[in-house]
Amino acid sequence: MVILGIDPGSRITGFGVIKVQDNKIYYVASGCIQITEITTPKRLKQIADGITQIINIYAPTEAAIEQIFMFQNPMGAIKLGQARGVAMCTLAINNLEVSEYSAKQIKQAVVGTGGAAKSQVQHMVQSLLGLSKKPPEDAADALAIAICHYHSSKSLAKISGASRVSQKRIK
């Protein structure tokens, strides 16, 4: 399984790719799509093009993205929503199922507490993936999203397996 995590942003969109094999997580790639265009349509196209390029290079089988969170600034929320929508649409166009996780869920899965600081997320991502240095914040967040997705999908598989067993016992 190859998982693509996306940390959407209107100025920087982070991405992280991990591979899971034999219940072990391996680092594949991470980075940031730097948004340099001025107009909103061109900025959104730049996000879509960047994600498409990542999909073409790394061929993920699953994708995950951070849910939108509360913003003090309404315009900031709108811009983030646009970036997130373009990212989700690009993933869907490329036939990837998209799972969504809150910042609290992601931090809980990676650090063990939903109130973790960004530096703690970076440190744990570095440790879990055996990286020689801490990844940049946006890339670390995207890798954390991918790791959270793996842990969540593993838990869901156990739960669905348990329900099949219990259904057999009832019959």
Curated annotation (Swiss-Prot):
Its cofactor is Mg(2+). One of its GO terms (biological process) is DNA recombination. It catalyses: Endonucleolytic cleavage at a junction such as a reciprocal single-stranded crossover between two homologous DNA duplexes (Holliday junction). The RuvA-RuvB-RuvC complex processes Holliday junction (HJ) DNA during genetic recombination and DNA repair. Endonuclease that resolves HJ intermediates. Cleaves cruciform DNA by making single-stranded nicks across the HJ at symmetrical positions within the homologous arms, yielding a 5'-phosphate and a 3'-hydroxyl group; requires a central core of homology in the junction. The consensus cleavage sequence is 5'-(A/T)TT(C/G)-3'. Cleavage occurs on the 3'-side of the TT dinucleotide at the point of strand exchange. Mg(2+) 2 binds at E66. The gene is ruvC. This is Crossover junction endodeoxyribonuclease RuvC. The lineage of its organism: Bacteria, Pseudomonadati, Pseudomonadota, Gammaproteobacteria, Thiotrichales. CDD domains: RuvC (cd16962). Pfam families: RuvC. Homodimer which binds Holliday junction (HJ) DNA. The HJ becomes 2-fold symmetrical on binding to RuvC with unstacked arms; it has a different conformation from HJ DNA in complex with RuvA. In the full resolvosome a probable DNA-RuvA(4)-RuvB(12)-RuvC(2) complex forms which resolves the HJ. It comes from the Bacteria.
